[in-house]
Amino acid sequence: MPGRHVSRVRALYKRVLQLHRVLPPDLKSLGDQYVKDEFRRHKTVGSDEAQRFLQEWEVYATALLQQANENRQNSTGKACFGTFLPEEKLNDFRDEQIGQLQELMQEATKPNRQFSISESMKPKF
């Protein structure tokens, strides 16, 4: 059983990093670092929390794949990633998670981004 769990975690980790390749460079960098930190942070959690963690990352990977496919079919050439987070979902977050979410939002919306991204750049998948 533990071997299967490790394989599942590794496969999901690689899948998420691979999906990040369709993101603009600054968001890819931010997302990759966040994924690495989160997977490292959850390495020693209990079985129940590990299952919830994997389920949420699988939902994220599925949503990102869907958005990447929609962006690829979009004729305007402008990629759009992300989703609305309803208040009910926010109420389920712990204080630590709210803090992480705020940090991510601040990083993702910084006006002085590290890279210059062309609007016409369409990610390849």
Swiss-Prot record:
InterPro entries on file: SDHAF3/Sdh7
One CC-aspect GO term: mitochondrion
Gene Ontology annotations of biological process type: mitochondrial respiratory chain complex II assembly; regulation of gluconeogenesis; succinate metabolic process
Primary localization: mitochondrion
A Pfam short name: Complex1_LYR_2
Assigned keywords, A-Z: Chaperone, Mitochondrion, Transit peptide
Annotated organelle transit peptide span: 1-30
Localization per record: Mitochondrion matrix
Matches recorded under PANTHER family: DC11 ACN9 HOMOLOG, SUCCINATE DEHYDROGENASE ASSEMBLY FACTOR 3, MITOCHONDRIAL
Task of the protein: Plays an essential role in the assembly of succinate dehydrogenase (SDH), an enzyme complex (also referred to as respiratory complex II) that is a component of both the tricarboxylic acid (TCA) cycle and the mitochondrial electron transport chain, and which couples the oxidation of succinate to fumarate with the reduction of ubiquinone (coenzyme Q) to ubiquinol. Promotes maturation of the iron-sulfur protein subunit SDHB of the SDH catalytic dimer, protecting it from the deleterious effects of oxidants. May act together with SDHAF1.
Assigned protein family: Belongs to the complex I LYR family. SDHAF3 subfamily.
Subunit and partners: Interacts with SDHB within an SDHA-SDHB subcomplex.
Protein name: Succinate dehydrogenase assembly factor 3, mitochondrial
Gene source species: Homo sapiens (Human)
Organism taxonomic ancestry: Eukaryota, Metazoa, Chordata, Craniata, Vertebrata
